[in-house]
Structure formats: structure tokens, C-alpha cells
From Swiss-Prot:
InterPro entries given in the database record: AAA+_ATPase, ATP-dep_Clp_protease_ClpX, ATPase_AAA_core, Clp_ATPase_C, Clp_protease_ATP-bd_su_ClpX, ClpX_bact, P-loop_NTPase, Znf_CppX_C4
Natural source organism: Prochlorococcus marinus (strain MIT 9312)
Domain of life: Bacteria
Region (Disordered): 52-74
Cellular component terms per the entry's GO annotation: HslUV protease complex
Protein name: ATP-dependent Clp protease ATP-binding subunit ClpX
Pfam families in UniProt: AAA_2, ClpB_D2-small, zf-C4_ClpX
A Gene Ontology BP annotation from the UniProt entry: proteolysis involved in protein catabolic process
CDD domains with a match to the protein in the record: RecA-like_ClpX
PANTHER family noted in UniProt: ATP-DEPENDENT CLP PROTEASE ATP-BINDING SUBUNIT CLPX-LIKE, MITOCHONDRIAL (PTHR48102:SF7), ATP-DEPENDENT CLP PROTEASE ATP-BINDING SUBUNIT CLPX-LIKE, MITOCHONDRIAL-RELATED (PTHR48102)
Keywords: ATP-binding, Chaperone, Metal-binding, Nucleotide-binding, Zinc
SUBUNIT field: Component of the ClpX-ClpP complex. Forms a hexameric ring that, in the presence of ATP, binds to fourteen ClpP subunits assembled into a disk-like structure with a central cavity, resembling the structure of eukaryotic proteasomes.
Amino acid sequence: MAKFDAHLKCSFCGKSQDQVRKLIAGPGVYICDECIDLCNEILDEELLDNQANTNNSPQVKKKLTNDNPKKSVPLELTSIPKPLEIKSFLDNQVVGQESAKKILSVAVYNHYKRLAWKVKEESKNSNSTDSQATKLQKSNILLIGPTGSGKTLLAQTLAEFLDVPFAVADATTLTEAGYVGEDVENILLRLLQKSEMNVELAQKGIIYIDEIDKIARKSENPSITRDVSGEGVQQALLKMLEGTIANVPPQGGRKHPYHDCIQIDTSQILFICGGAFIGLEDIVQKRMGKHSIGFTTNSDQNNVDTKKLVEPRDSLKNLELDDLVKYGLIPEFIGRIPVCAVLDRLTKETLESILTQPRDALVKQFKTLLSMDNVELKFEPDSVEAIANEAYKRKTGARALRSIIEELMLDVMYTLPSEKNVKEFTITKKMVDNLFSSKIVKLPSGSKRIIKESA
């Protein structure tokens, strides 16, 4: 240890404590703030040189330049998946919703075709001042459907197939700038985080804004008071949906004038907005059936036809712009989401198919879970139907299926891991009907297991 000196000096540049702002002591050495700054500059230069020399390596291409095909959207027209291919992949993951899947497949194909066209035109005109090429505008997507109908799943599956960054945002947490809540730019931060803060990759991603119906303004007529979580949020989202250079705080939260922000171009990001829009069908029915309200002289047959015309399940197929305006969305907001897909309410048959058909079906998931305990799980066909019927009664769509099976399997998954003699377990309709009153009977080693069910 060096002898203490009343006039401490930097061990690197020799300047005394009085000549520098800060002198940091270590075990027998001292370093001043100026030498620290110099060291940082040297390290930064070395880091930049290393990046420049290694950018051609496969590892760096994968993370920084997005040349890895599984980490970037192919921007060659011949490489973009065709609508039939996109829908085929959706069919493997999502049961039903044929019309919505077709609309989404075409919209997504056109979106990434537009990006490929933009890259092609930019490279063609990089050395030319001629800008006569047609500019293709972006078409965002609006998904309307009851809870549990598959809105989020469709968006997630699209992003999985295209292998692009995907982020989900909740519209109910957003507020107008200057009020307590999240700024709309925080939506972009989630996408950046999914892209490992890679701006170029994030700009090819998909953002799903859930509960978009919850930011409808509270009344059809503009109010004199500010609606900071309704119409105010719609106004704040306009430029982002249309395409702008947004400033995103890297740490989230509110933007600060003295903090650096990340700039991201939203014109290449596909926005998919989804909501249940409870009550929208009533608005459509009122518009369509307004001439048949009250007593009429029409025949009974005509009255039956009118009832069919305004059937709640089919009324949203006749959705018009004015209906969304009456619901509470401002015309400017609707104009920036030109593609609209209406999802059907799930039927009992569809719920039954959801249990068994998709790649990640719930039945397959629980079979995999029990296989880890060396137990083969089986479902009788009648039990699957009974589970679907119970889910249909709960009116929460496909979400009810997992809740029911979790309740059904609770005692089974609690007991089976400790049962060495059980190699097979079968879920029966009676177990579902009797609210999961089955019991496992422990048998001697080597004997088959049976299930006792209460009457």
C-alpha cells in the first residue's frame, strides 16, 4: 500500500486532486474523472471497430442485421407467403372463423407485399430524383368478435408464421398525453423489447391492440369535457396507425425533454385492433329493422323474414361505418383501420373441435403433462362433448375450456404423480356431469387400475 499523501494524485496522468473534479481511490491507486472519460472513449472506439469487422459473421447477422430468415420478414416478392399458405397455417392453429382467416390472410399478404415494393422502389430510385412510382398505403385491421372467439390467437398465429416481432397492448391502460396512465408510445416500446431493441426488425412487426372498443367515446355527440381515456386516446393513436416517426422512451413511462428517445417509423408496422364491441349488434339491428318496428300489415311470412334479417348472430355481417361511429369510434380513427373482420360466436361443435384438433389443443396439452408422469390420459368422446357443452353455457368462448379442464383434472394431477401403479387414466362423461366426483383406487402392483365414480 502506498504511503498516504496529503496531495493525492492520479496514478495515470499525475494530476493532483485540486486539478480534477473527482479522484477515485482504489487499492493503492487513484484515477481521475478525465482518465475515466478517456478510457470510455477508447473502449467505445474499440467496440465500434469490432462490430464493423464482425458484422459479416452469421451470429452478428442474426442479431444485428436481421439477415437470419427466421428473424426477419422476407422482402422479396417471391418469398412472401401467399394468402392460401397463410390461411392453411391458420387452419392448423385456429378452428372455425373461415371468413376472418381469409380476410386476415389477404390483408397480411398485401401489407408485406407493400413493404417489399417499398424496398424495391427505394433501391431503384436511390440515384434518381424521379418519384413518380405509385405509393402504396397501409391497411390496418379491425377484428370484431365476442370474448374467447380467437381474436388474439389469430394475430399471434400470424406473427408466428411470418416470424416477425409481435406485441400485445391493452387499450384500457392508455390515456391522452399529460394524464395519469400509459402514453400510446409505450405500445411501440413493447414491440422494441420483443425485437431486442432492434429498430429495423421492430418496424416489420405486428402490434395487436386489445380491448379497442373500450376507448370508444362515452356518447355519440362530442362532449365539452375531456375524455382522456376514450376519444383522447383515439386522437393520440391516429398518426401512429397512419404512419409517423414516433419518439419512444427506451425505459418506458412519460417522455422527458432531457432523455434520449428511440425513433421508430410506424408506417411499416401492421396494427391489428380487436374488441368485443358489446352492444354493436343492437345498433346494426336498429338500423336494419327500423322500418319493421310496431304493428304492420305484412303477412306472417314477411315478419319471419324480417326477424331473420336482424338475427343478432348475423347482424354484424351488415356492419357499416356509421354503426361504429354511433358506437363511439371517431370517423378519423375508423378510416385508419379500413380492413374489418367479424368473428363468429363459437358453437358447441366448434368448441368440441378446439379441444382436440389444433396443434396445441388442450386435450393434447394435458396428455403431454400426464405423460411426464408415465400416465396415458384418455378422453371418451362423450366427455369431450360434455366439456364443450359446459363451456358453451359459460359464454366466455374458448377460454372456458381450459378453466373446465383445470377443474376436472385438479384432483387427478394432485394424486397421480404419487401413484406408481397407475399407467392409464380415462376422463368419462359421467365425471364431467357429476362435477368431477371421480376417485382413483390404488391397486396392488401389476394389476390394472379402475376408476370409481359416484352415482
